[in-house]
Amino acid sequence: MSDFRKEFIEFAIGRNVLCFGEFQTKAGRISPYFFNAGLFNDGESLGKLGQFYAKAILAAQLPFDMLFGPAYKGIPLVSSIAIALADGGNNYPFCFNRKEAKDHGEGGNLVGAPLAGRVLIVDDVISAGTSVRESVEYIHAAGATPAGVAIALDRMERGKGELSAVQEVRCMYGIPVTSIVNLENIVDYLREQGNLAHHLPAVEEYRARYSSRMVEPIECGGGTPRAG
């Protein structure tokens, strides 16, 4: 695990963004961990979060021309990521959408740089994939191309089918998805931390029960995903 990924997990735990215990998910599952990126809610934590995203994006070597953050959570994210990338000498334009169209001033649903070229979507997590779908629609409508998605946490958890939400996005849109950390990173971290090791059995049991059973790389389109 890269140093910045371990540092991000420690940062998230320190901000109570990543917690361990018993939590009910929207799907009705009892999860042994909970991730709430909304608690990165001050200037210092948002600035650090943008730096972690920037490191993950650069480490993934994704080719892109600009950033897009879907409303609402993506708005502060895309701003902080653009600043962090620029601080490292990588200056990219960015854009985000409004939930409601504006009929005065500049008007429309989009704010920021015009959507053009290869667009990297940024969000906190991918659950149902709704914000990614809406983002892709905005990008295509502008004549631009989705280049990929960057998220904070990949839960690696399947929905109703055998694929995880991230794998579904990869298959549906044919674009890469990168994350600062994933569930495997969290498991590895717990194994190394004596003071948190008591949470490991529950997390491993949850992973075994709900993680995607598809073998990476996933064969999409003409191929058939293979169960592992």
From Swiss-Prot:
Pfam families: Pribosyltran (PF00156). It catalyses: orotidine 5'-phosphate + diphosphate = orotate + 5-phospho-alpha-D-ribose 1-diphosphate. GO terms for cellular component: cytoplasm. GO terms for biological process: 'de novo' pyrimidine nucleobase biosynthetic process; 'de novo' UMP biosynthetic process; pyrimidine ribonucleoside biosynthetic process. Keywords: Glycosyltransferase, Magnesium, Pyrimidine biosynthesis, Transferase. Orotate binds at F34, F35, S127, R155. Its EC number is 2.4.2.10. Gene3D superfamilies: 3.40.50.2020. Catalyzes the transfer of a ribosyl phosphate group from 5-phosphoribose 1-diphosphate to orotate, leading to the formation of orotidine monophosphate (OMP). Belongs to the purine/pyrimidine phosphoribosyltransferase family. PyrE subfamily. NCBIfam families: pyrE. Homodimer. This is Orotate phosphoribosyltransferase. It comes from Nitrosospira multiformis (strain ATCC 25196 / NCIMB 11849 / C 71).
